[in-house]
From Swiss-Prot:
The gene is rplO. Disulfide bonds: none annotated. Keywords: Ribonucleoprotein, Ribosomal protein, RNA-binding, rRNA-binding. Pfam families: Ribosomal_L27A. Signal peptide: none annotated. The keyword Nucleotide-binding does not apply. Belongs to the universal ribosomal protein uL15 family. Residues 1-39 are annotated as: Disordered. This is Large ribosomal subunit protein uL15. It comes from Caulobacter vibrioides (strain NA1000 / CB15N) (Caulobacter crescentus).
Length: 161
């Protein structure tokens, strides 16, 4: 019977590692297959995106968009996540929840610019939520379960609708 410590590849099926820079007799001595001098002969990797002086692709492409310094980022909470926290005993049924309570319950990690309630999943427990914004479907689902949603400040998408 073959033992695990006696396993070895078949004779001739693998090639040994080429040791470069070990004299002219090895066939890979002196410059070790790197050619002569220059940037690519040196140690380290070639510069990413460098195309030998030709204008690189990333600089030929047009610039687009900008970073809005006033952009708002929300901590998103889905209905299934709230239901999961209730089942785990982290949130009591009928509890009043705001951003601080959601952080304490471990539903979100941080508030960012506000909490946004989204409608993914189902909710069966009545909860009183106070959030920065919420989708219409999420509000309907919470109210259908016997809870309520208080939106403190409407998001842009809801204000336009």
């Amino acid at each position: 019977m073959t033992k695990l410590n006696e396993l070895a590849p078949r004779e001739g099926s693998t090639k040994g590692r080429m040791r470069v820079g070990r004299g002219p007799g090895s066939g890979k001595g002196k410059t070790a297959g790197r050619g002569v001098k220059g940037q690519k002969a040196r140690s380290g990797v070639a510069i990413n995106g460098f195309e030998g002086g030709q204008m690189p692709l990333h600089m030929r492409m047009p610039k687009r968009g900008f970073n809005n310094p006033f952009r708002l980022e929300f901590a998103e909470v889905n209905l299934w996540r709230l239901e999961q926290a209730v089942e785990a005993g982290k949130i009591k049924k009928g509890a009043e929840l705001d951003a601080a309570a959601l952080i304490a319950a471990g539903v979100i990690r941080r508030e960012l610019d506000g909490v946004k309630l989204l409608a993914k999943g189902e909710i069966k427990t009545a909860l009183k939520l106070t959030v920065y914004s919420a989708t219409e479907a999420a509000i309907k689902a919470v109210e259908a379960a016997g809870g309520s949603v208080t939106v403190t400040k409407k998001a842009k998408a809801q204000a336009e609708a």
